Regions:
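Ser/Thr/Gly-rich flexible loops in soluble cytosolic domains mediating phosphotransfer, phosphorylation
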Residues: 80-98
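Structured adenosyl-cofactor binding patch, chiefly the S-adenosyl-L-methionine
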Residues: 97-141
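Conserved RecA-like P-loop NTPase ATPase core
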Residues: 1, 59, 90, 123
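S-adenosyl-L-methionine/SAH cofactor-binding core of RNA-modifying enzymes
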Residues: 27-85
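Short glycine-rich anion-binding loops that position phosphate/pyrophosphate groups of nucleotides
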Residues: 7, 63-66, 91-94
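N-terminal beta1-alpha1 ligand-phosphate binding loop
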Residues: 1-23
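Catalytic-core regions built around general acid/base machinery
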Residues: 19, 76-80, 102
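Short, surface-exposed alpha-helical segments at coil->helix boundaries
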Residues: 13-20, 43, 97-100
């Protein structure tokens, strides 16, 4: 996960950290925080970070993106057969057009609008849930 800015809300940061630790125990997971700024400078920093991950499948979080069920997300990630995946979360004003153009898919968590901190916590939870679905963990209930 590449995200803009540091989390200021301690409760959300703690939840995100908990899911990050769980994901790290399941395999290779990294949360990269980039400095915030205007959308274009954030976009430049994101593209620089992505240059190091040219083999990854890129999901950009954007309100115009497609929503997925948790099961569908788990299936999609499983179908990548171990290929690295990067989820990009922009700052308070979203992602630059250049970042969206670089993405393999635009992904929306919901038609609702969330703060970027809530969105970060939600994507960490959904990634953990996707792993739980694939491993048959009791965390996910149908």
């Amino acid at each position: 996960v590449i995200a803009i800015g540091k989390m200021k809300n301690r409760s959300l940061a703690k939840l995100c950290d908990d899911f990050s630790k769980r994901l790290k125990r399941q395999g290779n997971f990294e949360l990269i925080e980039l400095k915030d700024g205007d959308v274009e400078s954030e976009g430049h920093r994101i593209l620089e970070a992505l240059a190091k991950r040219s083999d990854a499948s890129i999901y950009a979080m954007a309100e115009e993106g497609m929503t997925r069920t948790s099961q569908r997300l788990a299936d999609e990630l499983h179908s990548l057969q171990g290929r690295p995946v990067v989820f990009i979360l922009g700052g308070a004003y979203g992602l630059s057009d250049a970042v969206k153009a670089r993405a393999d898919a635009l992904f929306a968590l919901s038609p609702l609008t969330f703060t970027h901190e809530i969105a970060r916590m939600l994507i960490c939870e959904q990634l953990y849930r996707a792993v739980a679905i694939q491993t048959g963990s009791k965390y996910h209930h149908e």
